[in-house]
């Protein structure tokens, strides 16, 4: 064995060490991106729930037009954020709930148009303030007030999206490997045997 072989082995070791360090960094970066997206998605879904609950408050529509417009604009902004961010999600539960949300919104398009809300490109909502201001208050209450109202349904779906996104952020370990609480419970024998 010559000096050349020693250099080759050392070079190979350095190369492999650099390769695996890069792989670890990429896994960590991917995990951090997933956690960041999940955190942002959860925050946006929480904001949507708050905005939908505000619209579901029957006293809102007894207030002046500017207050109502502000609440509807806030709702639309939060809704559009959730639609945009859910489109970038890899979480099946987030995607399923977001698809239900946009589908339900589509089914209510005619009713929403009475409040000046239309569905635009990419399933995002747009507002015609003049139509909203001219809308009958009882029509607005029928759209936004009550458990089964549009706002009530959006509020519940926003909660589901938020919960799903929070689950996504915690499903990866610090090393970037998938972690399942159910699998961990089975492995540790902590699942109840009762049905």
Task: Give the predicted meaning of each segment.
Residues 1, 5-195:
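Polar, low-complexity export/assembly segments characteristic of proteins
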